[in-house]
């Protein structure tokens, strides 16, 4: 009677094969579990073929393990012949289902069915294989047994045809997978590469050992190896089916080489000690050897992996290690670290961006927080292609990423698992996919530097606050200074009380504009959430009228260039204070270009819809380049405008979200810019007429400034020098012109660099006072052009810039610098330095007169 004990299977080869069976079974259970999680259909798809293939692999490995145990000699030749035929059929069906699996994949890719001729090959070879293996003497005639792992199988006359069938399946499977690569996406190529790699390892080892060594050479000592290596196909193919994110070939080669080097270090010396020992003593020494390997593995792996990295990448640090080493770089400079990260990821120059959670594409956050940790464009493409149910929910996201050339969106999570920043990357310059190791490394890096990034954001916020207030307050302060100078003149000339009162009122209005600017800037940089502010139903016409009427315009010329909505009113839920600041911000951005674009206007209109209503804020100024229009809602992003915080439009987006809506930008460079403010339709809302006051038809009259024209046209005195004043702000030009009038110097004006070059060409100019930051053409470019025309003409910067780069450019391209707003004494000093003595003396005489 047969007596089974565990000692019968305690052989290294048998244990290896049974361990492989355990791994394959666990993988198969995990695979089925993942399919259930994803609600995948199994029957009629490639999943059914893969599961059948996996079951056959388990049967094949188990049957091979039998030949390396004590069961082989104990049960005898008849049982050995049965297990040999069983192993034949198990291996055949593994190859057959692998082939059918590839047919099913190819059919799904072309959105069709498996070809009839492919089904015919599968059925015919299966029937033939069953026939020759079930009928005695056709494939296995006898098994000569010496002991475990020591046996010889005598093959039958049909064995060669049986192996030809197996080889045919191998070839046809590879043909199917290679054919799938034609006109495939990058993701499909990666999947097929993994499958081909797994199939090649398994099938080639099977072909070489089973065909070469057993059939032709009669050596059965290595028959355990192909079943053990079958795990490679299981894992490679299964991994490719379950995931859409893959490790690069180089990284896999690096890991494999590192492990092989460590194994070589252990095998060579320990093998010399272990092999000469008797079998009983081998088990005694095995325990301390295993302990030694466990203790020293990590240390040796760390040392040898450097050499593996050098052989694979040409550097002792892998790209993953180089990415993780950027942690210290982020602490020194986030911008520099981002540039280095982009270079490591092979992203085009400065295209890798780290934006705050106020980014325009809010649905990025919705997807990231709900069902995935990273958005990868190629993965979305595959989901849309193969999953009909996913098309509705992801088509808009796919289209947005496609239009913005976005390949990767990765979140940074703050407290409460809320998204604080987004890492947004375009496609790689080499058009390759992001590998799994790159994505994992970047995620780890961003997690480590999260606190650094948040601290940097707060520092930038503080700098933006200081810079913006300093820059924006120059114009109101210049206006106050201008009114004081006018007031001084009027007092000296004994002007009537009404005129003096008017000067004081104009000065007070300038101070009020300054206060309003400070309020706007403080709102922009505030961390307070707009969601906490109360909202109420109101007429959108009323809200716009009130916002515009409360804005502090510099003069009535600006007011005359604004058109308010007169038709299609609607009800919106909003907070009037917050809405006012949104309109203030849009007006401020638009009128910044009014001097340089004298024909530009602001037109505010409305449009209603079934689900949302729209307020359209349109200005016909310079427009915005389409390539950067999606960036304008990023924090700290500023376009052709100096001194701003870069936070205004991000603040507008936050406010609109708090109203349940959003703001989007549509622009055409050189033609117009439109901001569309979307408000959700208010259900059961009263008529808009009942929520509004009568139209502010007289708002322009209420806002008209009685501003004194302190800078009238001046008659040119040919005996006096001429100074060209270049500044995009009228109040700054008016102040300088007033001082020049007092000094008896002629003046010409230009509102941007391009205009300055034209005025210089048409007039004789002795000195130029040049602002630095202006639309159309900045002061640096204008100075360079003027110096090419007349190198001797002095150019003095009229600027409040204090940045190191700007000061270096001023020293390089200009002849001096004058603070803005300037003073009479400072201007007199500049005239004395740069105009000839006769000109300076005549100016002084004119002043004394």
Swiss-Prot record:
Membrane-related topology note: Multi-pass membrane protein
Outcome of substituting residue 166 to R: Almost no light produced. Constitutive luminescence. Wild-type level of light
Transmembrane residue ranges: 9-29, 41-61, 160-180, 196-216, 220-242, 251-275, 283-301
Positions carrying Phosphohistidine: 471
GO MF: ATP binding; phosphoprotein phosphatase activity; phosphorelay sensor kinase activity
Keyword Aminoacyl-tRNA synthetase: no
Cell location: Cell inner membrane
A Pfam family reported for this protein in Swiss-Prot or TrEMBL: HATPase_c
Stored InterPro entries: CheY-like_superfamily (IPR011006), HATPase_C_sf (IPR036890), His_kinase_dom (IPR005467), HisK_dim/P_dom (IPR003661), HisK_dim/P_sf (IPR036097), Sig_transdc_His_kin-like_C (IPR004358), Sig_transdc_resp-reg_receiver (IPR001789)
Record text on activity regulation: The phosphatase activity is constitutive and the kinase activity is regulated by the presence or absence of AI-1. At low cell density the kinase activity overrides the phosphatase activity.
Chief localization: membrane
EC numbers: 2.7.13.3, 3.1.3.-
Entry protein name: Autoinducer 1 sensor kinase/phosphatase LuxN
Substitution effect: residue 471 to A/F/G/I/Q/R/S: Constitutive luminescence
Purpose: At low cell density, in the absence of AI-1 (autoinducer 1), LuxN has a kinase activity and autophosphorylates on His-471. The phosphoryl group is then transferred on Asp-771 of the response regulator domain. The phosphoryl group is transferred to LuxU, and ultimately to LuxO. At high cell density, in the presence of AI-1, the kinase activity is inactivated, and the response regulator domain has a phosphatase activity. LuxN phosphatase acts on itself.
Reactions it catalyzes: ATP + protein L-histidine = ADP + protein N-phospho-L-histidine
Biological classification of the source: Bacteria, Pseudomonadati, Pseudomonadota, Gammaproteobacteria, Vibrionales
Keywords associated with the record: ATP-binding, Cell inner membrane, Cell membrane, Hydrolase, Kinase, Membrane, Nucleotide-binding, Phosphoprotein, Protein phosphatase, Transferase, Transmembrane, Transmembrane helix, Two-component regulatory system
A GO CC annotation given for this chain: plasma membrane
Gene3D superfamilies to which the protein is assigned, alphabetical: 1.10.287.130, 3.40.50.2300, Histidine kinase-like ATPase, C-terminal domain (3.30.565.10)
Residues recorded with modification 4-aspartylphosphate: 771
Effect annotated for changing residue 475 to R: Constitutive luminescence
Primary gene name: luxN
Residue stretches making up the Response regulatory domain: 722-835
Superkingdom classification of source: Bacteria
């Amino acid at each position: 009677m047969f007596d089974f004990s565990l000692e019968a299977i305690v052989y290294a080869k048998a244990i290896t094969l049974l361990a492989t069976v355990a791994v394959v079974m666990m993988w198969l259970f995990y695979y089925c579990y993942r399919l259930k999680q994803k609600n995948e259909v199994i029957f009629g798809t490639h999943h059914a073929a893969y599961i059948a293939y996996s079951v056959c692999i388990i049967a094949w490995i188990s049957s091979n393990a039998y030949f390396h145990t004590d069961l082989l000699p104990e049960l005898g030749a008849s049982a050995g012949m049965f297990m040999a035929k069983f192993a034949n059929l198990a291996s055949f069906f593994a190859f057959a289902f692998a082939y059918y699996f590839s047919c099913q994949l190819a059919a799904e890719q072309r959105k069709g069915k498996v070809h009839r001729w492919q089904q015919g090959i599968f059925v015919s070879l299966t029937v033939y294989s069953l026939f020759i293996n079930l009928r005695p003497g056709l494939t296995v005639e006898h098994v000569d047994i010496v002991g475990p792992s020591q046996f010889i199988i005598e093959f039958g006359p049909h064995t060669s045809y049986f192996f030809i069938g197996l080889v045919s399946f191998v070839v046809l499977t590879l043909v199917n997978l290679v054919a799938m690569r034609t006109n495939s996406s990058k993701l499909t190529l990666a999947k097929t590469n993994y499958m081909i790699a797994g199939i090649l390892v398994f099938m080639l080892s099977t072909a070489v050992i089973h065909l070469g060594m057993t059939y032709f050479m009669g050596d059965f000592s290595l028959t355990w190896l192909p079943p053990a290596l079958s795990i490679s196909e299981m894992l490679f193919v299964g991994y490719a089916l379950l995931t859409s994110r893959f490790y690069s070939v180089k990284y896999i080669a690096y890991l494999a080489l590192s492990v092989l080097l460590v194994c070589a270090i252990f095998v060579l010396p320990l093998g010399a000690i272990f092999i000469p020992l008797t079998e009983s003593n081998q088990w005694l020494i095995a325990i301390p050897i295993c302990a030694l390997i466990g203790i020293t593995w990590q240390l040796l792996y760390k040392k040898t992996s450097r050499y593996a990295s050098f052989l694979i990448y040409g550097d002792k640090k892998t790209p993953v290690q180089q990415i993780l080493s950027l942690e210290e770089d982020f602490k020194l400079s986030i911008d520099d670290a981002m540039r280095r990260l982009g270079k490591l990821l092979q992203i085009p120059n400065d295209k890798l961006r780290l934006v705050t959670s106020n980014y325009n594409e809010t649905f990025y956050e919705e997807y990231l927080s709900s069902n995935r940790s990273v958005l990868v464009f190629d993965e979305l493409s595959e989901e849309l292609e193969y999953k009909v149910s996913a098309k509705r929910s992801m088509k808009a996201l796919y289209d947005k990423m496609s239009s913005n050339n976005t390949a990767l969106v990765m979140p940074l999570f703050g407290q409460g698992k809320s998204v604080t920043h987004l890492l947004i990357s375009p496609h790689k310059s080499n058009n390759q996919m992001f590998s799994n190791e790159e994505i994992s490394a970047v995620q780890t890096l961003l997690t480590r530097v999260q606190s650094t990034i948040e601290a940097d954001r707060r520092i930038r916020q503080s700098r933006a606050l200081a810079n913006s207030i300093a820059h924006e307050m120059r114009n109101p302060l210049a206006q106050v200074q201008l009114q004081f100078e006018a007031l001084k003149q009027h007092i000296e000339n004994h002007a009537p009380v009404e005129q003096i009162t008017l000067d004081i009122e104009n000065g007070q209005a300038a101070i009020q504009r300054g206060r309003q600017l400070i309020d706007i800037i403080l709102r922009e940089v505030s961390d307070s959430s707009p969601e906490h502010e109360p909202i109420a139903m109101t007429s959108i016409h009323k809200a716009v009228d009130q916002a515009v009427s409360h804005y502090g315009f510099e003069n009535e010329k600006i007011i005359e260039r604004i058109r308010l909505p007169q038709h299609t009113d609607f009800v919106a839920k909003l907070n009037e204070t917050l809405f006012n600041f949104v309109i203030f911000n849009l007006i401020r951005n638009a009128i910044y270009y009014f001097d340089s674009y004298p024909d530009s206007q602001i037109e505010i209109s409305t449009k209603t819809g079934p689900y949302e209503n729209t307020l359209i804020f349109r200005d016909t100024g310079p427009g915005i380049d389409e390539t950067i229009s999606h960036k304008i809602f990023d924090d700290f992003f500023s376009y052709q405008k100096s001194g701003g915080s870069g936070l205004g439009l991000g603040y507008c987006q936050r406010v609109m979200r708090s109203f349940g809506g959003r703001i989007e930008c549509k622009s055409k460079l050189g033609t117009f810019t439109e901001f569309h403010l979307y408000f959700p339709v208010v259900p059961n809302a009263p008529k808009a007429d009942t929520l509004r006051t009568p139209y502010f038809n007289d708002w322009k009259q209420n806002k008209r400034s009685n501003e004194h024209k302190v800078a009238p046209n001046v008659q040119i005195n040919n005996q006096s020098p001429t100074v060209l004043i270049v500044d995009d702000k009228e109040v700054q030009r008016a102040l300088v012109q007033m001082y020049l009038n007092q000094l008896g110097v002629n003046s010409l004006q230009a509102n941007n660099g391009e205009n300055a070059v034209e005025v210089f060409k048409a007039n004789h100019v002795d000195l130029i006072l040049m602002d630095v930051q202006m639309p159309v053409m900045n002061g640096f470019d204008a100075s360079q052009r003027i110096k090419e025309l007349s190198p001797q003409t002095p150019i003095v910067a009229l600027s409040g810039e204090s940045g190191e780069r700007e000061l270096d450019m001023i020293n390089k391209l200009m002849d001096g610098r004058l603070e803005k707003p300037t003073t009479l004494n400072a201007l007199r000093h500049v005239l004395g330095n740069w105009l000839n003595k006769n000109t300076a003396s005549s100016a002084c005489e004119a002043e004394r007169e």
